[in-house]
Amino acid sequence: MYVSRLQLQDFRIYRSLNLALPPGVCLFYGANAAGKTTILEALYYLATTRSLRASVERELIALEAAGDLGLPPFARLAASLQPQPEAEMQTIEIVLQRKFGADGDLAPTTSKTIRINKIARRALDLIGQLRVVMFAPQDLELVTGAPAERRRYLDVTLSQIDGRYVRALSRYNQVLTQRNGLLRTSRERGRAASEQDLAFWDEELAKAGVYVLRERRRAVTTLDQLAQRLYAEISGSDLDLRLNYLDTTPAHDVPSFQAALKQLRREERERGVTLIGPHRDDLSIQLAEREVGSFGSRGQQRASTLALRLAEAELMHSRTGDRPVLLLDDLLSELDQKRREHLLTTIVRPQQQTLITATDLDDFSPNFLSQITRMHVDHGLIFPA
């Protein structure tokens, strides 16, 4: 799969963009704040419905945006996808729109409209239409950050591979909110939630949670093997990079998940929160049996995150038969020459679309530059180089 065209309207710095993209490697270069990262962010948003940088979605809508015919301001993102060389072109689109409040002023909330081949669909239906793997400087948080970062890594990867996973995860989070609300309000009112109510939510949580757990464990088994090989190639080190899924319950089916919840009934009532499940799990990332985030050098941490991202791409390819689009955001400037050359060699593959951003061309060899498409970005304008 590759993205043949990207269209943006009032998305961050881009008032109007209609950009044709090549199927191979494309380098966007220019000064900081020129709009390079926004290209990658737009594709990531179209693939996952999540923003990499915005804390609230209204930040994605350009300040200068104006609605049509009295409508509130909106941003539009659309991409044309070529799944296979002989396959029919597909289109995906997101329209993100501000809302008017009761007083007629703009409210802080937004609405989101999603279309696939011009037909309105749900957000869950969009995920997996376009598969991407994002490499970014903040990827170090995968090994140094909180467990939520590593859970997100697994969830974003699996959601793009498996439509059932994204639905199970969504259902799990919905049930978790309801169950936590029941526990919390019961504690605040000093009145225990009924066993019947909790048993109902236990079963619903277990039904969704067991699938999430099973797929995460299965993915980590494969990612462990892939990342071990890739780390050795990237670093040239004989240290083993190992991944291990750290679950808060060993449950493998609905009854065992329910039993684990029931064992914690008293403590959960006292604390007003669900204490076990996929939302509490973690991913252990170790070199020579020591956590990379705590004991690894900066170089080891960076090589580990690269191995994780490349493993993510290989997992997507092996599960779907389709190579994801690779998005590399100003990453090469942080790598030494050896790792930079290895990464560039790795990503230049047939049927592998790769979009790279950089501030200048000094990080790339003349031979590499001769094989790719270059585009210069300057304050929201893009020029072929």
Curated annotation (Swiss-Prot):
> Which species is this UniProt entry from?
Herpetosiphon aurantiacus (strain ATCC 23779 / DSM 785 / 114-95)
Indicate where this protein resides in the cell. Cytoplasm
Q: What is this protein called?
A: DNA replication and repair protein RecF
Encoding gene (name): recF
Entry's family note: Belongs to the RecF family.
Q: Name one GO biological process term.
A: DNA synthesis involved in DNA repair
Query: GO terms for CC?
Result: cytoplasm
Q: Name the PANTHER family for this protein.
A: DNA REPLICATION AND REPAIR PROTEIN RECF
Q: Name one GO molecular function term.
A: ATP binding
- Membrane-crossing ranges are none
Q: Is DNA damage included in the keywords of this UniProt record?
A: yes
